[in-house]
Amino acid sequence: MSKDLHLENIRREYSSRSLSRKDLPKDPLDLASSWIDQAITARVNEPTAVIVGTATPDGRPSMRTVLLKEVLAGKFVFYSNYDSRKGRQIAANHHVALTFLWHELERQIHVEGTIKHLSPEESDAYFAMRPYKSRVGARISPQSQPIPSREYIMMRFAAESLRFVGREVPRPENWGGFAVTPTRIEFWQGRDSRLHDRFLYELEEDGSWSIHRLAP
């Protein structure tokens, strides 16, 4: 029988920062980029980590953490295996959500939008920048699929590493970039007494963004 956990008394106050309407630019991508830069400068743990939420066509959700690689041309960009669970769900349902959480800064960004693959050329350019072992690992991992043992994947890795000694490691066709085009972005700043600052940007038909303060 599983052990019960009683966590009712675990809490803390948030009081280090605030967020007001005058702090908000017209384009939420500018604020998102600024917050990510501040997280990097503050040396928070994994400042570019982002939770990616996907769902099957019948609405069964799943989430996982990846590392953001760019905020480019109004899109959030990350890279992964197209045959992974998230890759298969994205192929069937192009609506996704992203959540950035920086505990040290008492901040969160939540993004909703649509997603598509980057071009092969864009994926090739990033893949060539990756460390050698990361490129080899991307080639041999049947991501999200059952494997018999740790030894199985390490043997595949060793064999592929020897195969490409002194040679360029090509990007596998089932690995590449994803670009998320946001339609809603919410910024959350922790405040005293759970009266947090929350602002929601929503993309309008003319391409502009409306801004609303939300109740905490």
Q: What are these model-predicted stretches?
A:
Residues 1-216:
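Binding-site signature for planar aromatic cofactors or substrates
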